[in-house]
Amino acid sequence: MVPVVGADSAGVRHSPAVVMVCHNYGCAKQAAVRVDTSTLWWIDDVLQASADAAAEREALSRVLAQLYRLAARQSPVGNDRAGNFLDDGVEGRMDCIDHATTSTRWLALLEARGMLRFHRVLEPARRTRFILQHFSAVVEVLAQEPAADAPALEPAMLAAAEHGAARYDVAPEHAQAPATVAGERFAIDAWFVDHGEPAVVLPLDEWLKGGGPNVH
């Protein structure tokens, strides 16, 4: 994550940043891509509209697509296609190492700017099947604090809420479990898609077992 320049050390949420984007397989080449203020404002608006962790992951999928499109205006990565075979030998092609590394850098920038409310960014994950290995960026769901102005819960409701089973305005017998829970991890994998398309988001356990589109 070191090759992120301007990661908001001064606390300026939307100041321009430079992210090193890997390409040509195995991060053989890197291009310095400038993320401008208007793009960061747009990203912030998209992410802050997310009401929960699931919505934030869907937003991150779209945000990564936009960042890769931005990178294509400053580097040859617009030539990248899903998997490895469709763009073999093409300048700007990206394998899973390029995508996992670059996506993690994009996500780390957003995290450093305080734009992620429901997730934290982890190191890339690796899966191995037979003699092949594959990498992806990963995020983890954060524990959520109750709103400051939320009414106090009755003891029974509080106990249920601690296990994600109830809210103060829902009777315990009708409460639904949240779509995701704190500590759950998800792969955000842009290698599966053509350049500029939303990244594939999968539970990490499913991804580790070989989940995802059938591309090569």
Language-model-detected regions and their locations in the chain:
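Short, mixed-charge, low-aromatic patches
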Residues: 16-25, 54-65
